[in-house]
């Protein structure tokens, strides 16, 4: 019986990126933070649900802050220094996610709101009756 050849794997060095973009998608139910390079290639991401918050606790500003810190720390391995922040959506975690990225140690160069605004497009959901 022939022996299987064992191949030693060399660990590939992570590329260094200085400038990046933090995409914050803040919905009413969750907050998702994705950190990319300038071309849009993903470096790190985190969400409030993936950070251990379930149910109604996912949609809190604190959950968005924790998720933002996790994504920010994961992207530090790439040597990221400057971040441009793009916020999308009406959720409660918009501002706290930006503050958390600032607290991690990034230099935030620009904050822009890229929420989709309909020019009288689809009919919105009906009002809630609680």
Swiss-Prot record:
InterPro entries, per the entry: Ribosomal_uS11, Ribosomal_uS11_bac-type, Ribosomal_uS11_CS, Ribosomal_uS11_sf
GO CC terms in record: ribonucleoprotein complex; ribosome
GO molecular function: rRNA binding; structural constituent of ribosome
Gene Ontology BP, a term: translation
Database matches in SUPFAM superfamilies: Translational machinery components
Keywords: Ribonucleoprotein, Ribosomal protein, RNA-binding, rRNA-binding
Alphabetical list of PROSITE patterns matching this protein: RIBOSOMAL_S11 (PS00054)
Function statement: Located on the platform of the 30S subunit, it bridges several disparate RNA helices of the 16S rRNA. Forms part of the Shine-Dalgarno cleft in the 70S ribosome.
Subunit and interaction comment: Part of the 30S ribosomal subunit. Interacts with proteins S7 and S18. Binds to IF-3.
Family: Belongs to the universal ribosomal protein uS11 family.
The name this protein goes by in its record: Small ribosomal subunit protein uS11
Organism: Alkalilimnicola ehrlichii (strain ATCC BAA-1101 / DSM 17681 / MLHE-1)
Gene designation per UniProt: rpsK
């Amino acid at each position: 019986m022939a022996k299987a050849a064992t191949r030693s794997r060399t660990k590939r060095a992570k590329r260094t990126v200085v400038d990046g973009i933090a995409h914050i998608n803040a919905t009413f139910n969750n907050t998702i933070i994705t950190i990319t390079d300038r071309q849009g290639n993903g470096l790190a991401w985190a969400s409030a649900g993936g950070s251990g918050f379930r149910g109604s606790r996912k949609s809190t500003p604190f959950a968005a802050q924790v998720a933002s810190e996790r994504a920010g720390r994961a992207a530090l391995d790439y040597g990221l220094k400057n971040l441009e922040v793009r916020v999308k959506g009406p959720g409660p975690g918009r501002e706290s996610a930006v503050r958390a990225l600032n607290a991690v140690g990034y230099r935030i160069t620009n904050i822009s709101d890229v929420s989709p605004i309909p020019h009288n497009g689809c009919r919105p959901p009906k009002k809630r009756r609680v």
